[in-house]
Amino acid sequence: HDRFGINGIVAGYIGALRKPILEEILEAASKVNALSVLIVGGAPKGQAGYTNMIKELEELAVEKGANAKFTGPLPYSMMNECYAACDILMVGHYVDKRLRDYAIPKKLLDAMAYKVPVIVGPYDARMKIVERYECGIVTEDWAKALTKLSNNKTLRKKMGENGYKAFKMNYTWEAQEQKLLQVYSD
């Protein structure tokens, strides 16, 4: 937490900054006591207006009373520090509705690898992973899920451990290699 100048329970958002989802997250975070939000990332590829968007989101955070820290884009080599600073990771949805049910965001798997419980929307691919491995909460109500996880350290730890075990068994390069070798040998 010290690395980013934040305290309390930290809910992270890591990835391309999309205003609609961040507005939802800041609104939800403002309803949860002693919660800090770490927002890591830059503008989606090819989009301008990033500086103005950050300014607007920072103003919204102040207006709503959400304790938010925007880091801007950081190098990939710092992602381990970002995940380590998070007690919870919020996995936003894709803007393109056609992708929502099929895509598994890398940040979901990264959170599992770092033992961080996740909050995801009710979209098929990510919902199946989170429910199967009990490594987070599937919801459209960010505030309710943030409250539940921020108030229950034991639950956060259990979900984080569940995610880590599932990651090690199913999603490492070694696990994928074995699956591919099995496909080719059949």
Specify the residue positions occupied by each region the protein language model found.
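Nucleotide-activated donor-binding/catalytic signature segment of Leloir-type glycosyltransferases, i.e.
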Residues: 41, 51-81
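Hydrophobic residues in well-ordered beta-strands that form the structural core
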Residues: 39, 92, 120, 138-139
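Nucleotide-sugar-dependent
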Residues: 18-20, 75-81, 89-109, 120-128
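Conserved donor-binding loops in enzymes that form glycosidic bonds
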Residues: 13-18, 42, 72-73, 135, ...
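Conserved donor-binding/catalytic core segment of Leloir-type glycosyltransferases
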Residues: 5-20, 26-31, 37-40
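Conserved acidic donor-binding segment of nucleotide-sugar-dependent glycosyltransferases
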Residues: 132-141, 148-153
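A short alpha->beta transition loop at the rim of the catalytic pocket in nucleotide-sugar-dependent
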Residues: 87, 113-116
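A short, well-ordered alpha-helix in the C-terminal region of glycosyltransferases
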Residues: 148, 155-170, 179-182
